[in-house]
């Protein structure tokens, strides 16, 4: 039986990855940070709570990482923990750099000292590209990195230090350059769930409008279930590498709004307002990824479209108060 350690197991990706690994017979360990609301902190993994080993650790505290690694003795390590909200990174740039950037270095050094043969997945991000885009309109593994946010800068450091440790110490480290991926488990401060839940509240007459930022920004949105499958595939390869994980299809936030509101029988023009308060100091305008390498080399494929992903999110948001619907399985 393989043992896997997931940092940030209580996040969107961590919870789906834990489910996937359990289905494959893994012994799963997951780290969470201590905070003032431990019950809320484990909401996404409550349904598998008894099947995984939950431990407290923090990427900014190397001693806690060493302790967990010595206990778990993992064969595979998935580093998903981070301060992952781009807009928040402008308000908390130093913490973002420490947790998302230096935190990765703390983990790599801890692994090098305790279990250097373990295979490591690093959650890299399309935010590293910034507004750089190839002539054909896509971003891929060879596209120049030029981040436009503190979060993107921290992810570039993590990406580069992973490459450095792989080359310097022969460690099996793969960077997954993931484009935006969503689900019903996405945090409410991210635009997809903000739009979906905002629309549902309007239907229920719990809100009169929804205020958003730049509606023209476009993103390549996929489903988190598909993307954790890619993470696992990367660590099953004999040789580590870097891979873009994306659908190859881009939609604007206006597209997101239109589909969601019309699905619920609402006219978006009636309810949507915009405010510069929700725009970034430097905006990332366009993301669309080319995952040819991942698809051809590892056989990865998507099972959700933009529309079916949103359909699922709308269904769950609309049925959260319905006791006859088990929304935790989504």
Protein language model regions, located:
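N-terminal Rossmann-like NAD(P)+-binding domain of SDR-like oxidoreductases, especially those catalyzing
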Residues: 1-181, 225, 235, 304, ...
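Residue-level signal for the nucleotide or nucleotide-sugar donor/cofactor binding architecture
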Residues: 60, 91, 99-102, 142, ...
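Short secondary-structure junction motifs
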Residues: 117, 173, 207, 240-242, ...
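NAD(P)-dependent short-chain dehydrogenase/reductase
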Residues: 132-138, 156, 160-236, 248-253, ...
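C-terminal "lid/loop" region of Rossmann-like NAD(P)-dependent oxidoreductases
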Residues: 210, 214, 241-243, 251-258, ...
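Non-catalytic, hydrophobic alpha-helical segments
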Residues: 227, 231, 245, 256, ...
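C-terminal amphipathic/interface module of NAD(P)-dependent oxidoreductases
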Residues: 288-330
């Amino acid at each position: 039986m393989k043992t896997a350690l997931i940092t940030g197991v209580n996040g969107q990706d961590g919870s789906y990855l834990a489910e996937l690994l359990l289905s494959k017979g893994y012994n799963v360990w997951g780290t969470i940070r201590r905070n003032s609301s431990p019950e809320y902190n484990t909401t996404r993994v409550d349904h598998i709570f008894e099947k995984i080993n939950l431990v407290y650790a923090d990427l900014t505290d190397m001693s806690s990482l060493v302790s967990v690694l010595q206990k778990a003795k993992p064969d595979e390590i998935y580093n998903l923990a981070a301060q992952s909200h781009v807009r928040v990174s402008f308000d908390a740039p130093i913490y973002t750099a420490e947790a998302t950037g230096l935190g990765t270095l703390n983990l790599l050094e801890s692994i090098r000292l305790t279990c250097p043969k373990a295979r490591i997945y690093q959650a890299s991000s399309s935010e590293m590209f910034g507004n750089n885009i190839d002539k054909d309109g896509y971003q891929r593994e060879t596209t120049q990195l030029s981040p436009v946010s503190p979060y993107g800068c921290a992810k570039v450091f993590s990406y580069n230090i992973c490459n450095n440790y792989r080359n310097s110490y022969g460690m099996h480290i793969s960077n997954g350059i993931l484009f935006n991926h969503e689900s019903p488990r996405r945090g409410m401060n991210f635009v997809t769930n903000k739009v979906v839940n905002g629309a549902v509240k309007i239907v229920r007459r719990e809100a009169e409008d929804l205020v958003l930022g730049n509606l023209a920004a476009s993103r390549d949105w996929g489903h988190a279930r598909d993307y954790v499958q890619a993470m696992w595939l990367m660590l099953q390869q004999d040789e580590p590498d870097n891979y873009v994980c994306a659908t190859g299809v881009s939609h604007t936030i206006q597209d997101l709004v239109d589909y969601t509101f019309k699905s619920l029988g609402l006219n978006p023009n009636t309810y949507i307002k915009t405010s510069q308060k929700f725009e970034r100091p430097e905006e990332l305008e366009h993301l669309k990824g080319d995952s040819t390498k991942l698809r051809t080399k590892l056989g990865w494929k998507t099972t959700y479209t933009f529309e079916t992903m949103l359909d699922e999110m709308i269904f769950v948001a609309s049925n959260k108060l319905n006791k006859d619907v088990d929304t935790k399985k989504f």
